[in-house]
C-alpha cells in the first residue's frame, strides 16, 4: 500500500476517494526508562528509550490505519498526518489520519 503525506501520487491517477482513515496508539512510559533517558539527555546523548517508544507507537498507529484502508478497498492513503500527544500519567498517544483512495 502506498502511503504519502502529499495530496496525490505522482504518475498515478486517483480513481476513487474512499474515506478518511485513522489509527491510534497509546503507550505507557516506563519510569526506569524515563530516568535513564533523562540522564542521557543531560550528558548529550540521544534519548533512545523515548525514540524507541515513539517509533513503536507510530508503527502501531500506521498499521492500524493501513488495515482499515485495506478493509475499505483502498490501495493507497494520501494526505497523512501524524500527531503526537502526551496524555496524563506519562502516557504517549500517536494518532495518524489520511484519505483512503483507490489508484
Curated annotation (Swiss-Prot):
It comes from the Bacteria. NCBIfam families: PRK12855.1, PRK12856.1. HAMAP family: UPF0145 (MF_00338). Belongs to the UPF0145 family. This is UPF0145 protein BC_1816.
